[in-house]
Amino acid sequence: MGVGQSTELPGHAGTPEHLSHVLAERFATKCFTPLELTHFKDNFFSRAIDQGGMKYWNEKILSDFLGIPDSSDSHCPLDAGPVIFRMVSYLGAFPFQNTLAPSVLTFEAMVKVAVLLTERYGKVLRPARKDRIKLLFGSLADVGRRDVGASPGAEDVRKETDDSSAVKSHVTGFEVDAPANDDYGDEDEDDDDLALAALESLDAIDVFKHDSRIDKKVYEARISVATFRRLLMLLIVIAPLKTLEPVTSYSSDLNEARMESVRKEADTILAAFSTEDSDGGISYRSFANITSTALPYLFDPLTPLFEHLLFSKNLDMTKKSGSDAIVTDTIEKPSDSPGPSPSTIMLPGSFESSILKPSVVSHLSFFLPSPTSNVNLLRGNMRLHPVFSTAVHGSSLTSFSHNVLTWNAGTLLLLEGAVSEPSEHGEGMVTLGAYLPQPWKSAPLSHSSTKPSDSSALPCLFELSPKHQLLQGNPSPSVQKPNAPVAYFSTSTGIAIGCQVPPPSRSQLLTPTPLGAGSLTIDTSLDSATFYMSSIGHNGVFLPPATTSMSEETVKKQIDIYTLEIWGLVPEPSDASSAEPRQSAVELQRAKWEFEAREAERRRNLNLKAGAGDSAMEGARWLLETAGLIGDRPGQRGGSI
């Protein structure tokens, strides 16, 4: 790597320091291209502090380079620099967090940090997303910190670092990594699998067993709410960040109103993590459960953030230098112009959203996939097209049908209102939604099948506030029944999501009933809704949320609707999977509206005054029945997904 001699480890010999060096060498050569590594070195060494021959970064250098607001910036209320520095100091010691954490941010440590946070370790280690979650938890856990013994040399360097740095590291050791002999049963059989894979790749299993015994202490450690809130607020602000975009494009406009919106979303996400039984902190069990199931893309913004290390503005690799050849490998330069606002995900149309604020869009990207690929909504380059809003199109199912049934793509339903019967928790405003990757169909009781192996093709029902809750789509083929569509609407009963639709009846009006773990029903006037959620039930469209326990009662909320919005999911033209030109959902909808207008004009010209049995009369009646405008056959009016 250019910072030391690379030597291979024979057998099981070697110290943790040497093994850490070898792993960093392997990461650098296999996880980065030569050009990326050149840029990485320039970024690091051009800014590093030289203390007794050791080059390293302190907290201020790291925060300034990444553009992360910290306590030194009195004009910015987002103080996330110390949290990121703490995480990096922990991850830099991988896979020997017990012995080497907190690590000095040398080049080798930063290489490991960049590989782990950009998820490039798959070229050296087997992919293990769950184990990355444990590493992230360990890097954030600060309840019950302790002083870690270190060799005199390392301690001297750390002392010199503190003396020479204007900003302290805030990292004094990690109780999360203290070996313990407490018996926690088989709570997590694959602890430290990612670290184990690293040592397996170095033929150093014995060293691993000596340094990092099965560590059950992790289940006693906690992440403080204050620490996690600061990280969440940063992730919300930089969620739309693209590779090599400057962070300041998103952090420079943090006025009071923007920060209030960011805090609100952070608090709704925090509410999903159980802290009642954790002494005010977040336990590993809660952290791992929620981040892996209810917030699978929460840490995605860290990838483009740390990819900034792989491009240096000081280098122009396309020019000749003396007799050197032109470097053919290219890397995209970051734009100097301000980055786009998160709201640019919304395309212009018939209305502007009163629900989709930038912070809400960021919140959605933490758990909603792109319909075209298994990445989050923002990284999948999706756009949202305004399809229907009660504020503009009125509270009528006729208008809903005209706008939604003609949309031939996936949709996102959002609902904002007030709980009409506040619970003992004092809930007031609530924001709900449903992600429906399949288009609505005009045929009654139809059901679009999904691919169980493709999570992006599964629907989900969610609550954004006051508490983040996600009901994932059920991948079981057994729940795909004609009378249990994902979403259904009828002019007689309204809109039903995740419900069982009763058979038609001439004698009485039967309404859809909740099925499985969750459902949402909206009345025919689009004025009120009922949200149903249970901790049990695997026989419906949606599975129970990870944020509830088996002991919790079924939740039923009656909601007075303030705003109902439907947004169409539109992929970027450049992301179209087919090389053949194809009409977009927007163009198809316009074509359907034009067809409906022509048919309406044709119906106006029909002679309905002809005598009984007249062929014109029969033809007119047939046309109107076919259009579903007259006739009393059961199920004639309605639609579903």
Swiss-Prot record:
<comment type="similarity">
    <text>Belongs to the RTC5 family.</text>
</comment>
<dbReference type="Pfam" id="PF07534">
    <property type="entry name" value="TLD"/>
</dbReference>
<keyword id="KW-0963">Cytoplasm</keyword>
<feature type="region of interest" description="Disordered">
    <location>
        <begin position="149"/>
        <end position="168"/>
    </location>
</feature>
<dbReference type="InterPro" id="IPR006571">
    <property type="entry name" value="TLDc_dom"/>
</dbReference>
<protein>
    <recommendedName>
        <fullName>Restriction of telomere capping protein 5</fullName>
    </recommendedName>
</protein>
<comment type="function">
    <text>May be involved in a process influencing telomere capping.</text>
</comment>
<feature type="domain" description="TLDc">
    <location>
        <begin position="354"/>
        <end position="570"/>
    </location>
</feature>
<dbReference type="GO" id="GO:0005737">
    <property type="term" value="C:cytoplasm"/>
</dbReference>
